[in-house]
């Protein structure tokens, strides 16, 4: 059977499709359009609902139009209609009679049959002699009609029922079939398997039917009562009353007249020889003479025919009582469908609107993470993002900008957690709260040495000053005479006879080491700005001032090289005033000290000024009894000792054997060394120390902390690695939008120089990479760093360079013999550098060499046509006089006529001087020129020759 469509049902019901759709929505069935199909059970429910609505509006006029009919005599009860045939017409008096009071006995009408109930057998009599046969025939009829219970129920529900006190006239099936049928006013007990409620009341503990104490069950199969025995007492029933014709039968009110539609408990009859009332509708518990039949609640699921009073078989669609799980699931599914219908459609998919709710995601999150947070399908988010012009997969890491665009479209406020907040949340999982540790009691705080950073322009004498203070010669060991890494030292000076310790950080002055200088400014307490008295303020000097002021660090200015001819310290003071550093002698608060690091002049005054500034402006105290916290100043990979990190302890005390975490590196402290290489057992606040025992080389600037054990340290490092990897993927993800897809495709044609960088320390590698990425030669070429690392050049580096055709740059590192041989066999170029600016110069030259050559046109000669010779074999031959330059065979030329180029891109195919073929003819000589198949030449034309020459790219 084909499923009906909405518009087809509308035609059958004589209404429009819109009304049908609204009715289905009220019923809980959500249909998309008028052409949608619906299930047959839903169609039956829809027809019943429309029939019920029509009955409410037409019931009163129908009752007024009914013709009056006389009450049937008692003899009509012996008539024999077809078994199980329902009554066709109700009594006309039903419209004018009132229902009796519940519980009050009413006279039993004679000869009446209840509509919708099977009539007695064909040969049924009202005497005791025929009662047994009548009962047997009733049971046979019940068994025959049981398979048609569903049809009978539907047929009964569509027929009107008269009140208890109204006489009912029995009609034969062959009677007036066209008489109108009153519609049922209450809920019909249907058996629709797709309906959540069957129209009947589920009994509760307060209204469950209780059997009469004197009653015993009968086997009426839900249809009729057993024959009564004389001499028994009088039974009085509630609810459904048997509809069998008899004398003096008195029963309770009909179902639906009481509050809860309780099941009937038998229709009563008096006197011997009186036939008991038949069973009520589908379990109405009838039975004369105190006999009760089995029944079912009037508002619950109809149960099958069984032995009365002992419970019946389960219904056709499950056991009675309670709501099935299928019904609950259908209700939830309908609710979900309804919510989806209300959700906005974006790009063809429905996504619930967030209404501006805020949701937090980690750095490098993907669409899968967002889908899990807001409980939507991943594919739907991918579709929405594609609709917005962005192409990404569900597991691809996205940046913050993409998430903001997506959130504005779907109504969510998406916020990405910053790296600092995410790291704090991670540490809190391991009971490490950095914010609480900063709140220390004054009793636990003890004085610590100040951390002083020496900053300034390159070659202004920073390292020389530290050598003078430490009485060493570090500058002699620096390649190129410049500092290329941060050095951390601790010295002891005497201030007013008291020994005081000062921790010094020596930062590079070269412009390539901007990150190192910024990192040094963040770790320091006091900054010494070294300015050469002869050079004055230079670019890196200004940068160092900005770093120190951004970190809110007090500055002490050391005017160096005052012994050099041409030194002008006053000029330096005037220049620095423009940057907010006003000397004390000018009324400011910045201390200036004129020194000579080379001659060791006034260095002690500089140290005194540093200590005075630290004591006056800073509270240099720390808790040495807590777990160590600090920062990584520098890190490198040592061949014999592994990863070596130079750390500065800021809080607590670091001991040998502590489990530490530095960024994504972790390990246990195997040994600690000071700046002179001497072992140490403990390092307190403001102490620089070299730490051995880390599993990998940390990044310069990473904070380090002591964990409870190795397991916690490893878990913290691994989670940081996962977070950093996701953030890098999101940062490096190339967002390909539909608008600039062609532009991205054109950029793929750019020639890229792939580079692998290996260095001796993480700071040097970072500085070299930043410097190389700043090189701009042309839009046609670019640099791509495919790998960087700390340590010697390995076989993996060579293999990676082989695949990507990259150049390996070794900064203060070398490969072993086997790796060098492999690189030579594979044709991989390895360049070694010890000074950073030389590497920058070579890479810039390589990029210029990758540029495509440019050509320019150079005119080589002009020749005037003075004679034209015509040849049947060669065509026209121009006799010319070379006016300037030199004419060569095979060169490009053009014809100039009256100063206008008539034809371009011609070629001199033949060049003769008299009868000889020549390669070239110089200025002042005559020659014969043949231009191939081109013959449009005239006297006085000028033949101009030119050639394309390559121009050097700058």
From Swiss-Prot:
Stretches the record annotates as G2: 481-485
Low complexity bias (residue ranges): 64-101
Pfam families membership: EF-G_D2 (PF22042), GTP_EFTU (PF00009), IF-2 (PF11987), IF2_N (PF04760)
Protein's cellular compartments: Cytoplasm
Chain intervals with Gly residues compositional bias: 222-254, 264-321
Residues covered by the tr-type G domain: 447-619
Chain residue ranges for the region called Disordered: 47-338
Region annotation (G4) ranges: 560-563
Chain intervals for the UniProt region annotation (G5): 596-598
GO terms under cellular component: cytosol
UniProt feature, compositional bias: Polar residues: 165-176
Any one Gene Ontology molecular-function term assigned to this protein's record: GTPase activity
Binding annotation for GTP: 456-463, 506-510, 560-563
Keywords carried by this UniProt record: Cytoplasm, GTP-binding, Initiation factor, Nucleotide-binding, Protein biosynthesis
Cross-referenced NCBIfam families: IF-2, small_GTP
Function description: One of the essential components for the initiation of protein synthesis. Protects formylmethionyl-tRNA from spontaneous hydrolysis and promotes its binding to the 30S ribosomal subunits. Also involved in the hydrolysis of GTP during the formation of the 70S ribosomal complex.
Similarity remark: Belongs to the TRAFAC class translation factor GTPase superfamily. Classic translation factor GTPase family. IF-2 subfamily.
PANTHER family for this protein: TR-TYPE G DOMAIN-CONTAINING PROTEIN, TRANSLATION INITIATION FACTOR IF-2-RELATED
Protein's recorded name: Translation initiation factor IF-2
Organism: Bifidobacterium longum (strain NCC 2705)
